[in-house]
Curated annotation (Swiss-Prot):
It comes from Ralstonia pickettii (strain 12J). Belongs to the imidazoleglycerol-phosphate dehydratase family. Pathway: Amino-acid biosynthesis; L-histidine biosynthesis; L-histidine from 5-phospho-alpha-D-ribose 1-diphosphate: step 6/9. The gene is hisB. It holds the Pfam family IGPD. Its main location: cytoplasm. It is found in: Cytoplasm. This is Imidazoleglycerol-phosphate dehydratase.
Length: 196
């Protein structure tokens, strides 16, 4: 069973293409025009063992908001398309990831019900040129279009770069756990309702 997808999103603000393989090895080609976002997408690919090819052109002459948000939206659409009817998946995933003084926890549920709880007390407003508030916009876009419930908590951290990086690494690892095929589930949908 192939769990690959390609999605394009074209608006007056951005042109986005995401191709992924949920059963990959972490290979990635990233060109969003936002270097820090490329760095974070690399964390998702490597720690989620997802092959990821993302290209984006956006109105970054204004700021990075539309590009970051729309990449999150398109990634969410691609994950939803690749995962299909969710038969046989584990459904839930979680991960704790440290980076020096920072520690983050991410928990995901492929419930079909979009919901985001994002609790990251950033210690500064920017990491280089990247506005840290855009990280919540990325995950909000992802959640709303992947149809997942996502809890993100930075439990401690002093360096804002470390705070964000632990979040993205933990997200990749939680995603990997949730989309794994459970051989004991025998292709059933992981819900007592029989649908997600």
């Amino acid at each position: 069973m192939s769990r690959r997808a390609e999605v394009t999103r074209n608006t007056s603000e951005t042109q986005i293409r995401v191709a992924l393989d949920l059963d990959g090895t972490g290979k990635q080609t990233l060109n969003t025009g936002v270097p820090f976002l490329d760095h974070m997408l690399d964390q998702i690919a490597r720690h989620g063992m997802v092959d990821l090819d993302v290209s984006a052109t956006g109105d970054t002459h204004i700021d990075d908001h539309h590009t970051v948000e729309d990449v999150g939206i398109t990634l969410g659409q691609a994950v939803a398309k690749a995962i299909g009817d969710k038969k046989g998946i584990v459904r839930y995933g979680h991960s704790y990831v440290p980076l020096d003084e920072a520690l983050s926890r991410v928990v995901i549920d492929f419930s079909g019900r979009p919901g985001l709880e994002f609790h990251v007390p950033f210690t500064r407003a920017r990491v280089g040129n990247f506005d840290v508030d855009l990280s919540i916009e990325f995950f909000r876009g992802f959640v709303n279009h992947a149809g997942v419930t996502l809890h993100i908590d930075n439990l401690r951290g002093v360096n804002a770069h470390h705070q964000i990086e632990t979040v993205f690494k933990a997200f990749g690892r939680a995603l990997r756990m949730a989309v794994e095929i459970d051989p004991r589930a025998a292709g059933t949908i992981p819900s007592t309702k029989g649908a997600l």
